[in-house]
Amino acid sequence: CASLPDGSEAWYYMRIVEQDQGHVNEMLALAEEFSSKTYKYSDAQSLAMYMETSPSANSSALGTVTLKDTFTQLTWGSLGVERTGEAYTKLKELSGNLANVEIATHVTAKDGEKTETYEVTENFTMKWASQRIYMMDYERTMTELFTGDSDLFSGKRIILGIGNGDGVHA
């Protein structure tokens, strides 16, 4: 229980589970390798084994990309992005032979003479098996960072660029 400034109390709980770390290092390494390979088309060929491309998937959007999308989307289409700065890898959950890993980073892409910056979050759900690690789910969200440059305004409109469809947040 925590006491709040107004005198009220807030109750919370935390889950702490001690378990064998098992193959968590291999799963973290797979997430990092998968992520870095998407930046170079030729390196990404080995990722095709994880793809589950669906004909009903939106084959042109880069705001949200999953294993059901196209290989071209997975490899950033024609955007030509480069990772900038550190990529932050986080083990979000580990339960037996299942792990959820998140990688957060920034990427840049040239648009003519202008450089655009994007915030990227990748989520991996993996299952370890004795033969290999299975990629159960993958989702990459990408949102262009709004700079406020004058060329991003058109009359009464603001041009926001690539987003993941969650709307605008201040």
What are these model-derived regions, one by one?
Residues 40-43, 95, 131:
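Alpha-helix capping and helix-coil boundary motifs
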Residues 34-38, 99, 109, 124, ...:
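Broad hydrophobic/π-residue packing in well-ordered secondary structure
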Residues 2-24, 114-164:
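Short beta-strand edge/turn micro-motifs at domain boundaries
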Residues 63-69, 88-92, 100, 135-136, ...:
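Generic detector of short, locally flexible boundary/turn motifs and exposed helical patches
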Residues 52-59, 82-96, 134-139:
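Short low-complexity stretches enriched in small and charged residues
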Residues 69-115:
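Surface-exposed, charged secondary-structure patches
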Residues 2, 93, 100, 130-131, ...:
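Extracytoplasmic/cell-surface-exposed regions of Actinobacterial cell-envelope-associated
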Residues 3-79, 155-170:
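Core segments of small alpha/beta cavity-forming domains
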